[in-house]
UniProtKB/Swiss-Prot annotation:
Pathway per the UniProt entry: Secondary metabolite biosynthesis
Name this protein carries in UniProt: FAD-dependent monooxygenase AacuC
GO molecular function ontology, one term from the record: monooxygenase activity
Organism of provenance: Aspergillus aculeatus (strain ATCC 16872 / CBS 172.66 / WB 5094)
Top-rank EC class of the record's enzyme: oxidoreductase
C-alpha cells in the first residue's frame, strides 16, 4: 500500500538543538551584537529565514512560536528564485545541502490535448548567460522539493541553538511604546514580549488587527486550484501515463509542464519519486455540488470531482485523465485563489510589530514568487535592523522596521501584478493565436528585475536614503522594480474592471517588465 504524504506532520522533538551541532567553520560569522531581542511568530520558511538572518546580523532571537503541533510538510514543489537563493550563500551547510538535493527539470508548455506549444525550455533565470553571472553562488534549481527545503531550514535553525516552540497559538498582538516592547498573548493566556515582534504567521495573522484594525478583505480571483501529489509508481499504473512519461521516469529525469486549455490550465511536475499537479479552472467551470474551495490544506476531494471539472472542456489527453483517476481518494485539496489588496503599512503604529511573508502580502501560484518574496523580506528586515540598532542600541528597531517596509512595498506590489499577466497567458481562451504569433509568449514571466535583485546589498545601498526620507522628508526612489515604471498604487477591483473591459493587463504596463 503506497502512502500519500502530501500532508505530513513531523516530530516536534526531531529538531531539538541538543541533537544538532555545527563546527565553528560551518557557521557564518556573526555581526557585532545589536542587543536587540526579537520574537518571531510562525515557523514557516519566512519565520525560519528571519531567525537565521537575525542571528547572523547580531540580534537575539528570544523565541520562535508556532501554532502547529509539529513541523508541517505541506505541499510538493516550490520555486525559490535567484534573488532568494543568493542570500543563502552565507550558510555553508545550507549551500552543501542545496547542492546535494539539487534536481533539474525541463519545462514544456502544451495544449490540453497534448499538442506541444513550447519546449524543452527553462525558466529565464537559468539561461546560460545568467548562470555565468551567478558563478560562485549557490545553484538555483528550477524547483525545490518543499519537504526537503523546509527540513534543511529546520536543521540550520537547530544548529545555531534555536528551538521552535510548537503548539503556541497567538491570539493577540500588542505593543507598549513607553516600555519599548511589542508582544503577544497565546491561547493559554501566556504573555511574551521583546523589543520587536515579527509576525510570520501567514494570512489571517492576528497582527492585522493591531496594524490595520481588521483582516484584509478577500475577493475571489475567479479561479481556484485542485492540488494533489502522489507517488510516481502509482501514476505509472495508468497505461496512458506510462506511455507518455514512462521513459522519462526510467531515465531519472524530471519534467515541469503547463497544460493549457480554454478557461483552465494544469501545472504538472513529474519526477522519479512523485508526481504533483494543480488544476486551475475559472469558476464558471466548477462542478455544481462539488467541494467548496476553502483556505485549508486538509485534503478532502475525490478524483472524480476533478475529472468532472476537467471534462467541462473536451479532448484532454488521456495521460492527464489517467493521472487524476489514479490519485488516491481524499488526497486532493481544493483551494480558492483569493486576492487581498496590498496594504502599504506592514508595521504597527509604534513600530514594535512588523509583518513578513504571507502575513504582509499573500500571493497566488501564478506569481511563482511567494517563497522568493518571503525570503527577500526576511533578509531585508534583518539587515535593516542591523543598521538601525548599530552599536548595541535596540531602540532603533522601529525605524529599521519602517525602512524595511519602505524598501519592500513597491517591489512586492509589482510582483503581485505580474501574477495577473501570467494568469492571462495560462488561461488564454484562444491558444491558436499564441501558436501563430510567438510561442515564447506563453512562457511564465520571470523578468530580470525580479531575479537579479540582491535584497541584502539593496539595504546597504538604500538605507541612508530611506532614513533621510522617513526622518527628514527628503525624496526617495526605489529601484528594485521594473525600470522606467511609474509606480502607482492599484487594487484588485481596478484590475478586474480592466479585464471585464477587454483590456489585457500586460498591455497596460509601463516601463520594462521583461
Amino acid at each position: 500500500m503506497v502512502s500519500n504524504e502530501y500532508l505530513t506532520h513531523g516530530d516536534k522533538d526531531e529538531f531539538d538543538p541538543a541533537k544538532w551541532s555545527s563546527t565553528p567553520g560551518e557557521l557564518p560569522p556573526r555581526s557585532p551584537a545589536t542587543n536587540l531581542n526579537v520574537l518571531i511568530v510562525g515557523a514557516g520558511p519566512a519565520g525560519l529565514i528571519t531567525a537565521l538572518e537575525c542571528w547572523r546580523k547580531g540580534h537575539n532571537v528570544v523565541r520562535i512560536l508556532e501554532r502547529s503541533q509539529g513541523p508541517v510538510y505541506t505541499g510538493d514543489i516550490i520555486v525559490i528564485g535567484p534573488s532568494a537563493i543568493c542570500t543563502l550563500r552565507h550558510w555553508p551547510e545550507i549551500c552543501r545541502e542545496l547542492d546535494q538535493d539539487r534536481s533539474d527539470s525541463v519545462m514544456y508548455y502544451r495544449r490540453h490535448n497534448g499538442e506541444l506549444i513550447l519546449g524543452p525550455t527553462t525558466l529565464g533565470y537559468n539561461s546560460p548567460e545568467h548562470l555565468a553571472q551567478r558563478h560562485g553562488l549557490p545553484y538555483v534549481a528550477p524547483h525545490q522539493v518543499r519537504r526537503q527545503f523546509y527540513r534543511m531550514l529546520l536543521r540550520q535553525v537547530a544548529r545555531i541553538g534555536l528551538q521552535v516552540e510548537y503548539g503556541q497559538r497567538v491570539e493577540r498582538y500588542f505593543e507598549d511604546e513607553a516600555a519599548g516592547v511589542g508582544g503577544v498573548v497565546t491561547a493559554d493566556g501566556s504573555v511574551r514580549a521583546a523589543h520587536l515582534v515579527v509576525a510570520a504567521d501567514a494570512f489571517k495573522t492576528r497582527s492585522d488587527l493591531l496594524i490595520a484594525g481588521r483582516h484584509a478583505p478577500t475577493r475571489s480571483s475567479g479561479m481556484s486550484v485542485y492540488r494533489a501529489a502522489l507517488p510516481t509508481e502509482l501514476a505509472l499504473r495508468d497505461p496512458a501515463f506510462q506511455a507518455r512519461w514512462g521513459e522519462v521516469v526510467a531515465r531519472g529525469e524530471s519534467h515541469h509542464e503547463f497544460w493549457i486549455g480554454p478557461g483552465m490550465h494544469l501545472g504538472l511536475f513529474i519526477s522519479p519519486n512523485f508526481v504533483a499537479y494543480g488544476l486551475s479552472p475559472r469558476d464558471k467551470f466548477l462542478q455544481p455540488g462539488g467541494i467548496e474551495p476553502i483556505e485549508s490544506w486538509d485534503p478532502d476531494v475525490n478524483p472524480q470531482e476533478v475529472l468532472d471539472v476537467l471534462h467541462r472542456i473536451p479532448d484532454w489527453d488521456p495521460a492527464i485523465e489517467g493521472l487524476i483517476r489514479h490519485t488516491p481518494p481524499r488526497a486532493t485539496v481544493h483551494w480558492p485563489l483569493l486576492w487581498r489588496n496590498l496594504r502599504r503599512e506592514w508595521t504597527s503604529k509604534a513600530g514594535r510589530v512588523v509583518q513578513v511573508g504571507d502575513a504582509a502580502h499573500t500571493t497566488v501560484p501564478a506569481s511563482i514568487s511567494g517563497g522568493t518574496l518571503a525570503i527577500e523580506d526576511a533578509v531585508t528586515l534583518a539587515a535593516c535592523l542591523q543598521l538601525a540598532c548599530a552599536g548595541g542600541a535596540p531602540g532603533g528597531a522601529p525605524l529599521g522596521a519602517r525602512i524595511y517596509n519602505l524598501l519592500r512595498y513597491q517591489r512586492v506590489s509589482c510582483v503581485q501584478k505580474m501574477s495577473f499577466v501570467n494568469s492571462e497567458n495560462l488561461g488564454a481562451a484562444d491558444m491558436n493565436e499564441v501558436l501563430k504569433k510567438d510561442p515564447e509568449k506563453v512562457k511564465v514571466r520571470f523578468p530580470k528585475w525580479l531575479f537579479q535583485h540582491d535584497p541584502e546589498a539593496y539595504v546597504y545601498e538604500k538605507y541612508g536614503q530611506a532614513y533621510a526620507h522617513l526622518v527628514l522628508g527628503t525624496d526617495f526612489q526605489n529601484t528594485n522594480f521594473p525600470p522606467g515604471h511609474d509606480f502607482k498604487m492599484w487594487t484588485i477591483e481596478e484590475i478586474h474592471a480592466d479585464i471585464l473591459a477587454g483590456k489585457k493587463v500586460a498591455d497596460l504596463l509601463d516601463g520594462d517588465w521583461d
